[in-house]
Amino acid sequence: MKKYLGIVLMALVIAGCTSRVPQTEQPATIEPAVPTPSKPQLPPSESQPLPTPPKIQVPVLDWSAAVTPLVGQMVKTDGIARGSILLLNKLKNNTNGSLQTAQATTALYNALASSGQFTMVSREQLGVARQSLGLSEEDSLESRSKAVGLARYVGAQYVLYADASGDVKSPELSMQLMLVQTGEIVWSGNGTVRQQ
């Protein structure tokens, strides 16, 4: 019965479609598009120099003036034995622009080496250790577990983290010295980096 009712309903719908009177409408007029003449774009002639793009100006910061007093405070920390092995992590850029972090890390490395308090893990030794552990050269060791693993691999007792934040023209520098054995932060300090 339901099949019969469905067939009758379909027949009525189909019959209703054919009995509609078609409405006549005027066909839409199509106007052909008239192309507008345009001047062809010519490449600039060789006699006309191209404008030079603006250079990104990275501020020249005095890193050594900022890190030297902080290193001076750090070496006075109680409990740090002279000659302790220190692994220096790359400076992390958390500013609102681009910083030359390699210069900052080098200034920090030089200040620490000249203090005589620490025996620094050499860059060559650090590179070999990174390769052995499968860490890339670009890995900034933000993960404390990676830093501790690398420090233990090279035999370092301390890891120094450095971070620049705030305005790129005058960033705030913060440093933390971590004891590898326990993960304890044994010293931290802050300073402002000024332009040269």
Curated annotation (Swiss-Prot):
GO terms for molecular function: enzyme regulator activity. Gene3D superfamilies: ABC-type transport auxiliary lipoprotein component. Residues 24-54 are annotated as: Disordered. Residues 1-16 form the signal peptide. Keywords: Cell outer membrane, Cell shape, Lipoprotein, Membrane, Palmitate, Peptidoglycan synthesis, Signal. One of its GO terms (cellular component) is periplasmic side of cell outer membrane. A lipid is attached at C17 (S-diacylglycerol cysteine). InterPro entries: LpoB (IPR014094). It holds the Pfam family LpoB. Its main location: membrane. GO terms for biological process: peptidoglycan biosynthetic process; regulation of cell shape. The keyword Transmembrane helix does not apply. The keyword Membrane applies. A lipid is attached at C17 (N-palmitoyl cysteine). It is a lipid-anchor. Belongs to the LpoB family. Regulator of peptidoglycan synthesis that is essential for the function of penicillin-binding protein 1B (PBP1b). Interacts with PBP1b. This is Penicillin-binding protein activator LpoB. The gene is lpoB.
